[in-house]
Amino acid sequence: MRRFNGFIKGINFGGWFSQCSNEDEHYRTFIGEADFKKVKEWGFDHIRIPVDYELFENSNGFKYLDEALDNAHKYNLNVVLDLHKTYGYSFDDGEGENGFFESEKLQEKFYELWDKLAKRYVSRSSYVAFELLNEVTDIKYCDIWNEIADKTVKLIRQYSKDIKIIVGGYHNNAVSAIKDIDIDFDENIVLNFHCYEPLLFTHQGAYWIKTMPKDFRIPYHTSFSDYLKIAHEHNIPLIIDDGVKDLNDTPSPQFFENLFKEAINIACKRDLPLYCGEYGVIELTDINETLKWYLDIHEVFAKYGIGHALWSYRKMDFDFENERYDEIRHKIIG
């Protein structure tokens, strides 16, 4: 499997140009040049920058993004430019499925936006990669998403044959959806997934999961049988089947290796890089338990050369910048 060179150790700048107030003051102040310098000094090689379509409805939107890319280049950081939300579609509960996959008009706005982005940024292909859309939700969108993604790749390829284009699948970029990505692959396509498994651990106490008790806490090395029992009691999704051989076991690097095995095999067969664009642990979790999770998943990322960008640098309920990470941050980054 080919490595995604230059995009091996990354961090998300979530909440800056996406999932935010969409006001100039926020765009100007949430992240600055010093933050690019800091993540470079920490040891990251790239930043994933989520952007919502609203950014480009701001008269200064492209200016803000230009400045971000200039700062990344200044500090020798590569960038994944991720379209996090588009017209008529968001992965967020309550915002989401507002006609994008059914409306040719909304799809045309998606193509028009990527046409603008491609024209403006393919000249930066030495350090910028494009991610077409964040977290397609339902499997029912699989076929139409493949059509949209394929058409968008062809559009971008009119401007550049070598810029890296990152494509994920349904169930919020689940690793199990890699097998159903069906586009006209070329050597500069990157297969993308996200991983927050076991969700009951990484999202313990998460307020946005409606059935999650806000005071719920769980240690990482809980048996899978208990994970399943608790998840069932609270009606919380838990995708562990492909990673578990014995329900008496607890999470380990082998769990993640089993979970990723099919996607790794597909990437090897297609000779394409595999990239985990989001993964992380909510800030409510005990910091030593958090470290255990990161060390296990990183062992598998390193073994197979899987590029990755943890979620997220500042705030956003994950807050890797927070001082609670000061003693262990270097152990996580490696």
Which residue ranges define each predicted feature?
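Catalytic domains of carbohydrate-active enzymes, especially glycoside hydrolases
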Residues: 30-52, 262-269, 298-300, 304-309
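Active-site region of glycoside hydrolase catalytic domains
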Residues: 104-250, 257-282, 296, 303-309
